[in-house]
Protein backbone atom coordinates (compact mmCIF):
# COMPACT_ATOMS: atom_id res chain seq x y z
CA UNK A 1 0.00 0.00 0.00
CA UNK A 2 1.35 3.44 -0.88
CA UNK A 3 1.81 6.11 1.78
CA UNK A 4 -0.80 8.19 -0.05
CA UNK A 5 -3.30 5.35 0.36
CA UNK A 6 -2.72 5.39 4.13
CA UNK A 7 -3.56 9.12 4.18
CA UNK A 8 -6.56 8.79 1.84
CA UNK A 9 -8.03 5.55 3.22
CA UNK A 10 -7.11 5.64 6.92
CA UNK A 11 -6.87 9.33 7.84
CA UNK A 12 -9.16 11.25 5.42
CA UNK A 13 -11.93 8.63 5.58
CA UNK A 14 -15.40 8.94 7.15
CA UNK A 15 -15.16 8.55 10.91
CA UNK A 16 -16.79 5.35 12.19
CA UNK A 17 -20.50 5.84 12.72
CA UNK A 18 -20.41 9.44 11.44
CA UNK A 19 -20.84 9.61 7.67
CA UNK A 20 -19.42 12.84 6.22
CA UNK A 21 -17.38 13.54 9.37
CA UNK A 22 -13.72 13.47 8.42
CA UNK A 23 -10.47 15.21 9.21
CA UNK A 24 -9.80 18.58 7.57
CA UNK A 25 -6.22 17.64 6.65
CA UNK A 26 -3.74 14.84 7.28
CA UNK A 27 -0.19 13.81 6.47
CA UNK A 28 2.58 11.34 7.17
CA UNK A 29 5.93 13.10 7.52
CA UNK A 30 9.36 11.60 8.16
CA UNK A 31 11.29 12.62 11.27
CA UNK A 32 13.54 14.64 8.93
CA UNK A 33 10.58 16.73 7.75
CA UNK A 34 10.19 15.02 4.36
CA UNK A 35 6.54 14.55 3.39
CA UNK A 36 5.74 10.90 2.69
CA UNK A 37 2.10 11.63 1.82
CA UNK A 38 -0.43 14.35 2.52
CA UNK A 39 -3.97 15.42 1.80
CA UNK A 40 -4.42 18.27 -0.66
CA UNK A 41 -5.51 20.45 2.28
CA UNK A 42 -2.45 19.85 4.49
CA UNK A 43 -0.67 23.17 5.18
CA UNK A 44 2.76 23.99 3.80
CA UNK A 45 4.97 23.98 6.90
CA UNK A 46 8.33 25.56 7.66
CA UNK A 47 11.38 23.47 8.68
CA UNK A 48 11.55 25.30 12.02
CA UNK A 49 7.94 24.30 12.76
CA UNK A 50 8.82 20.63 12.22
CA UNK A 51 11.99 21.05 14.32
CA UNK A 52 9.88 22.42 17.18
CA UNK A 53 7.51 19.47 16.98
CA UNK A 54 10.38 16.95 16.96
CA UNK A 55 11.99 18.75 19.93
CA UNK A 56 8.72 18.49 21.88
CA UNK A 57 8.72 14.72 21.40
CA UNK A 58 12.25 14.45 22.84
CA UNK A 59 11.71 17.24 25.43
CA UNK A 60 8.01 17.12 26.41
CA UNK A 61 6.71 20.57 27.30
CA UNK A 62 9.03 22.39 24.86
CA UNK A 63 6.08 23.80 22.86
CA UNK A 64 3.83 24.62 25.84
CA UNK A 65 5.05 28.22 26.35
CA UNK A 66 4.97 29.23 22.66
CA UNK A 67 2.31 26.95 21.22
CA UNK A 68 2.57 24.50 18.34
CA UNK A 69 2.93 26.17 14.94
CA UNK A 70 2.15 24.41 11.66
CA UNK A 71 1.75 26.21 8.36
CA UNK A 72 1.64 29.51 10.22
CA UNK A 73 -1.30 28.41 12.39
CA UNK A 74 -0.76 28.48 16.15
CA UNK A 75 -2.30 25.74 18.29
CA UNK A 76 -2.43 25.75 22.09
CA UNK A 77 -0.75 22.54 23.27
CA UNK A 78 -3.10 20.42 25.38
CA UNK A 79 -2.52 17.20 27.26
CA UNK A 80 -0.86 14.52 25.14
CA UNK A 81 1.37 11.53 25.83
CA UNK A 82 4.99 12.47 26.52
CA UNK A 83 7.22 11.34 23.66
CA UNK A 84 4.34 9.71 21.77
CA UNK A 85 1.43 12.09 21.05
CA UNK A 86 1.12 15.88 20.85
CA UNK A 87 -2.34 17.43 20.83
CA UNK A 88 -3.22 21.03 20.05
CA UNK A 89 -6.37 23.14 20.08
CA UNK A 90 -7.38 26.20 18.09
CA UNK A 91 -10.94 27.49 18.34
CA UNK A 92 -13.40 24.73 17.45
CA UNK A 93 -10.68 22.58 15.89
CA UNK A 94 -7.25 21.22 16.59
CA UNK A 95 -4.45 18.84 15.73
CA UNK A 96 -3.17 15.43 16.81
CA UNK A 97 0.37 14.24 16.01
CA UNK A 98 1.44 10.65 16.69
CA UNK A 99 5.13 9.76 16.58
CA UNK A 100 6.18 6.38 15.21
CA UNK A 101 9.67 4.95 14.82
CA UNK A 102 10.29 6.74 11.51
CA UNK A 103 7.40 9.14 10.95
CA UNK A 104 4.87 11.58 12.36
CA UNK A 105 1.17 11.03 11.63
CA UNK A 106 -0.76 14.34 11.52
CA UNK A 107 -4.49 14.89 11.73
CA UNK A 108 -6.14 18.32 11.68
CA UNK A 109 -9.85 18.72 12.42
CA UNK A 110 -12.68 21.23 12.72
CA UNK A 111 -16.16 20.74 14.16
CA UNK A 112 -18.25 18.62 13.86
CA UNK A 113 -15.27 16.26 14.30
CA UNK A 114 -14.35 16.04 17.99
CA UNK A 115 -10.86 15.93 19.53
CA UNK A 116 -11.50 12.32 20.58
CA UNK A 117 -12.43 11.28 17.03
CA UNK A 118 -9.27 12.89 15.62
CA UNK A 119 -7.16 11.21 18.31
CA UNK A 120 -8.71 7.82 17.51
CA UNK A 121 -8.10 8.09 13.75
CA UNK A 122 -4.51 9.37 14.04
CA UNK A 123 -3.41 7.14 16.91
CA UNK A 124 -4.92 4.00 15.38
CA UNK A 125 -2.82 4.45 12.21
CA UNK A 126 0.23 5.45 14.27
CA UNK A 127 -0.08 2.35 16.44
CA UNK A 128 -0.42 0.17 13.33
CA UNK A 129 2.74 1.69 11.81
CA UNK A 130 4.59 1.13 15.10
CA UNK A 131 3.51 -2.54 15.04
CA UNK A 132 4.93 -2.77 11.50
CA UNK A 133 8.29 -1.43 12.69
CA UNK A 134 7.75 1.93 11.00
Curated annotation (Swiss-Prot):
InterPro entries: PFN, PFN_euk, PFN_sf, Profilin_CS. Disulfide bonds join 13-118. The keyword Disulfide bond applies. PROSITE patterns: PROFILIN. It is found in: Cytoplasm, Cytoskeleton. Phosphorylated by MAP kinases. Its main location: cytoplasm. The keyword Oxidoreductase does not apply. Keywords: Actin-binding, Allergen, Cytoplasm, Cytoskeleton, Disulfide bond, Phosphoprotein. The modification Phosphothreonine is found at residue 114. A motif (Involved in PIP2 interaction) lies at residues 84-100. GO terms for molecular function: actin monomer binding. Gene3D superfamilies: Dynein light chain 2a, cytoplasmic. One of its GO terms (cellular component) is cytoskeleton. Belongs to the profilin family. The variability of the residues taking part of IgE-binding epitopes might be responsible of the difference in cross-reactivity among olive pollen cultivars, and between distantly related pollen species, leading to a variable range of allergy reactions among atopic patients. PANTHER family: PROFILIN, PROFILIN-5. Binds to actin and affects the structure of the cytoskeleton. At high concentrations, profilin prevents the polymerization of actin, whereas it enhances it at low concentrations. Occurs in many kinds of cells as a complex with monomeric actin in a 1:1 ratio. This is Profilin-2.
Amino acid sequence: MSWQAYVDDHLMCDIEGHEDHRLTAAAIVGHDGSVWAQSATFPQFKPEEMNGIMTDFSEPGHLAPTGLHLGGTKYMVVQGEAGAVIRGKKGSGGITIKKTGQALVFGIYEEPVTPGQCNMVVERLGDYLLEQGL
